[in-house]
A protein has these predicted regions:
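Cap/insert and terminal regions of metallo-dependent hydrolase folds
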Residues: 158-250
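Active-site environment of divalent metal-dependent phosphoester hydrolases
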Residues: 55-59, 81-83, 153-156, 171, ...
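Catalytic core of the metallo-beta-lactamase
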Residues: 101-167
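Conserved beta-strand hairpin/beta-sheet module of binuclear metal-dependent hydrolase folds
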Residues: 1-41, 131-150, 163
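Active-site metal-binding loops of divalent metal-dependent hydrolases
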Residues: 7-8, 28-30, 54, 78, ...
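Active-site metal-binding motif and surrounding structural segment of the metallo-beta-lactamase
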Residues: 31-79
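Divalent metal-coordination and catalytic microenvironments
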Residues: 17, 27, 53, 73, ...
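Glycine/small-residue-rich loop that forms an oxyanion/phosphate-binding "nest" at active or ligand-binding sites
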Residues: 60-128
């Protein structure tokens, strides 16, 4: 199993898990051509695409994917409706999946999980989207993987994981400094802290809401161009978790096998 990182920023997000005979595309925020290139132009091996939410950097290319491939494209009902409201005829091509249910896409198994917190005031989403999801993904070559982005926390505790892809978007002190310098305005600051995961929150969620016992690697995704420090993020997450930590960069290919040989 290999993980191809095509894009992992506000410019566009796209990842491919490539097994021996199949592949799974995560997000539709990068050109389809880049996905094809990552797969050596063998787009036919793709079993499906999963989308977390409707924002352009995660789903802006979905029409292109639907028009030029036959892969099923999966999203929540809310995400599908939000995307369809922007593009005529789009809804018919999307596959709606439900939170907590198991689905099979070729050799891959996925369990979507709504990014929602339930409290005394009811439920609320942890990103400013219609119905955002994170996903558990399983394949015999890699074991279980958690993919969670564009959220300030995880919705529950996750166990039995071999790898984790998790957003680490900003550091609070860097964000505060950039606000003071006028690099980031207050409106953007307020949205960032209520829709994205900080370094401190990332460490907290990893150490409190995931069982790290069998985790082989943690990949930090969706870092901010202005408010992150990749080297620092890698050091601090590694120190807190004791795990191998990789900061996602476009063009990377990472060995994602569950076993070393």
């Amino acid at each position: 199993m290999k993980l191809h990182i095509i894009g992992s920023s506000s410019d566009g997000n796209g990842y491919v898990l490539e097994a021996e005979s199949s592949a799974l595309v995560i997000e539709a925020g990068v050109p389809l051509k880049a996905v094809k290139q990552a797969l050596g132009w063998n787009i036919a091996k793709v079993s499906g695409c999963i989308i977390t939410h409707e924002h352009g950097d995660h789903a802006g290319r979905v029409k292109e994917y639907l028009q030029d491939t036959v892969m099923p494209i999966c999203a929540s009902f809310g995400t599908a409706e939000a995307m369809a409201s922007r593009t005529e005829g789009l809804r018919r091509g999307l596959t709606v999946v439900k939170s907590g249910e198991l689905y099979e896409l070729g050799d891959f198994k996925i369990i979507p999980q709504r990014l929602e917190l339930i409290d005394s005031d009811g439920g609320h989403y942890t990103h400013d989207a219609a119905e955002p999801f994170c996903y558990q993904i399983h394949h015999p070559e890699m074991g279980a993987v958690l993919f969670a982005t564009d959220t300030y926390c995880l919705p529950r505790r996750f166990t039995g994981l071999a790898s984790i892809l998790i957003e680490c978007n900003y550091a609070q002190d860097i964000l505060d400094r950039n606000v003071a310098l006028g690099i980031v305005d207050e409106k953007r600051r307020d949205r960032t802290v209520t829709s994205h995961m900080s370094l401190d929150n990332c460490i907290h969620e990893l150490t409190h809401k995931t069982d790290l016992g069998d985790v082989r690697r943690i990949v930090l995704i969706h870092g901010s161009d202005d408010n992150s420090d990749p080297g620092r993020f890698k050091r601090e997450v590694a120190a807190a978790t004791g795990k191998t930590v990789i900061v996602a960069q476009a063009g990377m290919t990472i060995d994602f096998n569950n076993k070393p040989f």
